[in-house]
Amino acid sequence: MFILRVHSVDSERPISVEEEESGFTYASKRAQPPLKLIQPSLKLTDRKGLIHLYRKSSHSSLPNPSSRSTTLFIVAVPNYLSSLDFIRFCDSRISQVSDILFIRNDGMEDRYSVLITFSDQSEADGFYNNLNGKKFAPSEAEVCHILYVMSVEHTEFDEVAAEAPTGFTELPTCPICLERLDPDTSGIVSTLCDHSFQCSCTSKWTYLSCQVCRLCQQQDEILNCSICGKTENVWACLVCGFVGCGRYKEGHSIRHWKETHHCYSLDLRTQQIWDYVGDSYVHRLNHSKIDGKSVEMSTSCLSHQGDCGLCECSEDTGISGAIFNSKVDSIVIEYNDLLASQLKGQRQYYESLIVEARSKQESSIAEAVEQIVVNTMQELQNKIEKCEEEKSGITEVNTKLIKEQDTWRKKAKEIEEREAALLGSKDEMITDLQEQIRDITVFIEAKKTLKKMSSDTDGIREGTVLPVPISPEPVSSVRRQKKSNRRK
């Protein structure tokens, strides 16, 4: 049973039958009867969105009565069929349909999908049995693929639509990619041709919007991993078309599965499909090594190349199984021994690389330290020489200043002595002048007295002369006498 999630980018729009009939359609090239079987209660709507198709991880073959529902999903309808052309394709089985929703994707203009809801389970089963696997047009290659849908969810968020429900895995919506999957995986029971991507049928398909189909048709181009660019062991995701290298290279393909949970990947060289969840191949067809033709692939076959003589699906399962198990055991032992020896060699090799790297690191560190020490010593030596030059200059200046200091000291002492002598001579001169002034003053006063006495002669005549006591001669008079003598 399938679950459908639609990332809607707009709301549902009703479709007018009259407007559709007035337009040009692919079917209008031929004479088509008018649409008289459409019930008035039929709801025809159109919507744009991106479809995500999910199926239960525990696969089971179809048809299965317990996995039916009244909602059917047509995977891919070619765009040359208009809405009314598709209704004409359904013919009289459209009478019991209650709702038809056409889902279109702007990124896939060559096809659209259809969601049909029936009012009765028997009518849904009849529609499925009569139209599933039928060509849309006799001259075209496209086949109608119908799936039973358990539930349909519409969301405006791409993250919600792209997240797989618990226990479900996402399937591609391209019909060719679905047909190449195992029936237990895709839910498509049969196919009209092998779709080996080299037959004329594939070239007539118009689904060039499928990235995987374009990659398979580009036989002349060299395909490479979209992450690392490797050209060997390249795989393509069936759901989104991501191209990555296998697990024996950089493992970008399996990394993509872990990130997006898109578990189906196509080997672009062998056209084989691998299921990462089931850890096995799930492709419907395999190419024979002998004649290059496509042969049916058993789902229980364990061999990569589809050679059932080496696995449990052969006729004699007991003997073949024992032989296969013994071969597997011997190969496992051989590869374990080889792996152990290789790991030991790799360990020794990487240990030697580590030792060499450490020695190189230590030598480089020692050289760097030595260079730093040399540079530091050179800088210190330059500073010492500069300081010594400054010291010698300062010493010379200091010596010169000391000499000048002694000279100025002598000059100052001489000046002090000269000033002291000059001051002494000035003091003596001042003292001498003072004594002279006093003498002159005494002389003048004595002269005045004598003049006065001369005018009064009578008093002198009647006077008495008395003796005057002799006093020691003052030093000043002695000095004056010396000076007077000196002057003489």
From Swiss-Prot:
Comp. bias intervals (Basic residues): 479-488
UniProt pathway: Protein modification; protein ubiquitination
Zinc finger (UBP-type): 208-301
UniProt keywords, alphabetically: Coiled coil, Hydrolase, Metal-binding, Transferase, Ubl conjugation pathway, Zinc, Zinc-finger
Record-linked Pfam families: BRAP2, zf-UBP
GO annotation, biological process: protein ubiquitination; regulation of seed germination
GO molecular function: hydrolase activity; protein heterodimerization activity; ubiquitin-protein transferase activity; zinc ion binding
Residues annotated for Zn(2+) 1 binding in this entry: 225, 228, 245, 252
Region described as Disordered: 453-488
UniProt binding sites for Zn(2+) 2: 237, 240, 256, 262
Oligomer and partners: Component of the heteromeric E3 ligase complex made of BRIZ1 and BRIZ2. Forms heterooligomers with BRIZ2 via coiled-coil domains.
Protein name: BRAP2 RING ZnF UBP domain-containing protein 1
Species in which this protein is naturally found: Arabidopsis thaliana
